[in-house]
C-alpha cells in the first residue's frame, strides 16, 4: 500500500507516541524524514534517531523522544503543507510559532531548515510543519 503523505505519517506517529508516553517510535526511513529529524534533533525537540537496516533493503528510523520532568518536550506538532495544499512563505511573510518559542520547518532551495535558519540565510520555501 502506498502512502500519500509520508512526512504527515511520521509527524502523527511522533505525536501519538508522545501522548502515550513512549520512549521511542519507529517510522519507515526516507531522505526527507531524515532531514526533518535532523532539524528536530538540532533544535532539541528529540534526543536523536538511528537508522535500522533490515534484510531486503528496508530500513526504519528509531526516534528517541524527549521528555522534561515526565512531560513531552513536543507539546504541539502539526503538518502545514500537505500534498493537496502546498503552503509557501517568503522571508518577509514567514510566521513565528508561539512568539518564537516554537519553530517551523521549511523546505528551501538551500535544504530543509528551521524558520530561524531560513531568516538568517534570507530564503523562503515550503512550510512543512510547525513544532512547539
Curated annotation (Swiss-Prot):
GO terms for cellular component: ribonucleoprotein complex; ribosome. PROSITE patterns: RIBOSOMAL_S8 (PS00053). One of its GO terms (molecular function) is structural constituent of ribosome. Transmembrane segments: none annotated. GO terms for biological process: translation. Keywords: Ribonucleoprotein, Ribosomal protein, RNA-binding, rRNA-binding. InterPro entries: Ribosomal_uS8 (IPR000630), Ribosomal_uS8_CS (IPR047863), Ribosomal_uS8_sf (IPR035987). One of the primary rRNA binding proteins, it binds directly to 16S rRNA central domain where it helps coordinate assembly of the platform of the 30S subunit. NCBIfam families: PRK00136.1. Part of the 30S ribosomal subunit. Contacts proteins S5 and S12. Belongs to the universal ribosomal protein uS8 family. PANTHER family: 40S RIBOSOMAL PROTEIN S15A (PTHR11758). This is Small ribosomal subunit protein uS8. The gene is rpsH.
